[in-house]
Swiss-Prot record:
Family: Belongs to the kiwellin family.
Organism: Oryza sativa subsp. japonica (Rice)
Name used for this protein in its record: Putative ripening-related protein 1
SUPFAM superfamilies: Barwin-like endoglucanases (SSF50685)
Main location group: secreted
Pfam families in alphabetical order: KWL1 (PF24300)
């Protein structure tokens, strides 16, 4: 009887650990799910380089309710900009004067945040921005993605208007540590 109970307890523990990989790792982080190797180099500064491998992700770090750590990057949502094609949520381009963002694949959550506002905190300020696109963490290095690598799993890709509203200017524009939450 004791042996049966012990085996049952081990089986349950195994199921829990397999079902909740974040608990078995103990870090709650998002690990790469694969990689893309670029076959060509393009002229833009941030474009993929031939022969280089870029990690892909199907996840993002877990959101923590009131504030989730992220890296804000600058995106051009206008037609012809470095954001690639039209926004995933509405198949439209957006002016960079609009307070809009794209979220990494895991946070984009299959479009469940489309049209919703997120609160971004940085530089002692806070701003609300509308989610209009996915910053694709699974694909990249192609024309659809403006030949840029896949998005890292912890990115909030923001329009110039978001940067301006947060008072982030000059050499700080490009990448900036922020926190964000659903509004």
């Amino acid at each position: 009887m004791a042996m049966t109970n012990c085996l049952l307890a081990l089986a349950i523990a195994g199921v829990v650990l397999v079902s909740l990989p974040g608990l078995s790792r103990g870090d709650g982080e998002c690990n790469p799910s694969g990689a893309i190797r670029s076959s060509t180099t393009h002229r833009c500064q941030d474009c993929c380089k031939a022969g280089q491998s870029y990690p892909t992700y199907t996840c993002s770090p877990p959101t923590t309710g009131s504030s989730t750590d992220a890296v804000m990057t600058l995106n051009d949502f206008d037609a012809g900009g470095d954001g690639g094609g039209p926004s995933e949520c509405d198949e439209m381009y957006h002016s960079n004067t609009e307070l809009v963002v794209a979220l990494s694949t895991g946070w984009y959550a299959g479009g469940s945040r489309c049209g919703k506002s997120v609160r971004i905190n940085a530089n002692g300020r806070s701003v609300l921005a509308k989610v209009v696109d996915e910053c694709d963490s699974q694909r990249g290095c192609d024309e659809e993605h403006a030949y840029q690598p896949p998005c890292r799993p912890n990115v909030v890709d923001a329009s110039q208007a978001v940067w301006d509203a947060l008072g982030i200017t000059g050499e700080d524009v490009g990448e900036y540590d922020i926190t964000w939450s659903d509004a």
